Amino acid sequence: IPSKKYNNVLFFNILEHLPEYKLVFSEIYRIIKKRGNFIGSVPFIYQIHAAPNDYFRFSREFLESNLKKYKFKKVKVKSLGFGPFIASYSLLYPYLRYLPFFSQICLLVAYILDGFIQIFVKTDLKEIFPLGYFFIAKK
């Protein structure tokens, strides 16, 4: 791929499947045009998937520091999720999906409980129990 060819590179739920993420960051930086964007997401609290090729879980701090390390500017990372009960539901979903009605009730209860807890906690719960992260890094 020629250098500085693309305005944007999209990378949704791929990075955790690549053992050489350092090469990915440098290669994406190389192929993005000046002022281009590297946009993507990674799971965090989520079951292993596509095994045996699910290598990493990346934290907010890791994404911010490593994208900057590889020369990206204006790095923004946003937590995805809702709270501890939705995080628990997402881990149980592979089993709950076989009981669709029960699964929907569990999901509703999880949203209600997370909303109730959020009333009493000052910290945004998705910052403590992120299902994943969405990021935008500008060249």
Regions of interest found by a model, annotated:
Residues 23-26, 53-56, 92:
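Short, glycine/charged-enriched secondary-structure capping and boundary segments
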Residues 84-139:
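A C-terminal cap/extension of S-adenosyl-L-methionine-dependent methyltransferases
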Residues 55-71, 77:
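Short alpha-helix
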Residues 1-49, 60-64, 135-137:
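Conserved SAM-binding loop
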Residues 17, 56, 126-130:
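Aromatic-acidic/polar surface patches that form glycan- and anion
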Residues 40-41, 65, 74-79, 83-85, ...:
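Preference for well-ordered, secondary-structure-rich cores of eukaryotic proteins
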Residues 46-50, 83-88:
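Short catalytic/ligand-binding loop motif for oxyanion handling, primarily in non-cytosolic enzymes
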Residues 36, 72-73:
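A structural micro-motif
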